[in-house]
Each structure stands twice: as C-alpha cells, then as structure tokens.
C-alpha cells in the first residue's frame, strides 16, 4: 500500500511540475509574440507575471530591460539591465544596452576611478557569475585530489613532481575561485545600489524637507544607498557627492 501512495504522490508532483513548466512556456511565448508585434506593455506584463509566479533570472531581467527601452522608459530599462548584470556580470549585450539607455538620461556624472587593483579585482569577480565561480572551485579541487593521488601513489620522480606542482597550483586556483564566489555572492546580497525613478529630485543635506538643497538629480541615475532613516535615503553619487533624498524616489537594483 505504501508503494502505491508514494507512486501517487510522485505522479502528482511530476504533473504539478509539468503544469508549471507548460504555464511558464505559455507566458514566455506570449511575451515573445507581443514583443515581435511591438506590444511592449503586454510583453512587460507577461514577464512580470513570470517573475511573480516562477522567480527571476538574468534573461528575464534582460528581456524586461529591452521592453522598457522600446517604451522609452529608460529608468526602468536601466534598472532591469543592472539587475541582469547583478546575476550575470558577463552579459555583454546587457552592458552595451545599459550604456545606450544612460545616454538618454539627463545626468552625465564623471565617476571617481577607484584604485587600479580594486578595478582589476572587481573585473575578475565580474568575469563569471557566483555559480560559475563555485563550479570552477569544485573542478580545481578535484584536480587537486588527482594531483595528490599522483604524488602519493606513483614512484617515478617525474610523475611525483608533476603531481605535486599540479596539486599546489590546483588548490591555489580553488581558493581563488572560492574567494571570488563569495565576493560575487556578497555583491548580489548587499544590494546597496539603486536607480532614481523620480523625474527630478532635490538632494538635501539632512533627511528632512528643511534640509539645505545641495544639488538636483534626475531619473535613470545610479546611486549608492549608504543608509536610510524615516523614509529618507542617504545616497552617494559616483563622483563622491553625498546627500539625502526621499526613499520613494529610488528602486533598489
């Protein structure tokens, strides 16, 4: 009897999963057809429904970015391209498209370049997604085991040397991959960057309307959120300027 119950439960679960897959594919087909026929709002609605029901992924954010770009909703396009790059920093098309969208925005702020080694390290980190770094770490760890096996279980000097240096190189590369997998994960979880969604907003010296007006920024600008307080966000621009603006005018990447 127990076997029949288990089989029945398995059948129900498989049927449920197949139903989800079919429903998701139907929505993807709807979104693609709507995009091809220039019905961009319908495309957006379909992708948003997929995100709500089935979760998000880089391709979904990229397609949403394209639909918003076609609508000339550049802040939303930038937001979704940035979200795509957060999960898949190696997506070249998203990198190009987000720069095209930024050209349509008002603010053109010169960024302060970080130290060269920070840029270099971040570039390495963004070469792969977190999962890819993790897979590479596993591969190098397996090569480390093979190298150790070669060193300990062979008697020829040349092979022992090859095994030793292979194991040494593999464990170093494994640790590097683990480091960048962690760095990429922290980068995703930190979520301290946001896109300005308000057409124009005055940035103030304190979290209150009575604060001194420092400067004005516009929709589509990417900022770093340093802290929040009572409906206000302390933001930092890429040129180092800092101030407070209403949190409702921001959408976190």
How would you describe each model-predicted region?
Residues 36, 189, 196-225, 229-230:
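Beta-loop motif signature
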């Amino acid at each position: 009897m127990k076997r029949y119950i288990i089989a029945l439960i398995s059948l129900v679960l498989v049927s449920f999963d197949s139903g989800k897959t079919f429903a998701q594919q139907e929505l993807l087909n709807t979104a693609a057809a709507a995009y091809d026929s220039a019905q961009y709002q319908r495309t957006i609605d379909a992708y948003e429904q997929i995100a709500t029901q089935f979760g998000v992924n880089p391709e979904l954010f990229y397609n949403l970015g394209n639909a918003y770009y076609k609508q000339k909703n550049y802040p939303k396009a930038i937001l979704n391209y940035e979200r795509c790059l957060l999960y898949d920093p190696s997506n070249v098309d998203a990198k190009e498209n987000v720069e095209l969208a930024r050209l349509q925005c008002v603010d053109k702020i010169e960024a302060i370049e970080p130290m060269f080694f920070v840029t270099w390290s971040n570039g390495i980190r963004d070469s792969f997604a977190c999962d890819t770094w993790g897979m590479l770490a596993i591969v190098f760890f397996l090569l480390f085991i093979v190298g150790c096996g070669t060193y300990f279980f062979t008697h020829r000097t040349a092979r022992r040397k090859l095994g030793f240096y292979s194991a040494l190189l593999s464990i170093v590369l494994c640790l590097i991959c683990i480091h960048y997998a962690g760095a990429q994960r922290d980068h995703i979880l930190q979520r301290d960057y946001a896109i300005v969604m308000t057409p124009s907003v005055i940035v103030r010296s304190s979290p209150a309307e009575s604060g001194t007006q420092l400067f004005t920024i516009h929709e589509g600008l990417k900022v770093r959120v340093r802290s929040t307080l009572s409906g206000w966000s302390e933001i930092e621009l890429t040129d180092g300027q800092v101030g407070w603006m209403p949190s409702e005018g921001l959408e976190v990447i």
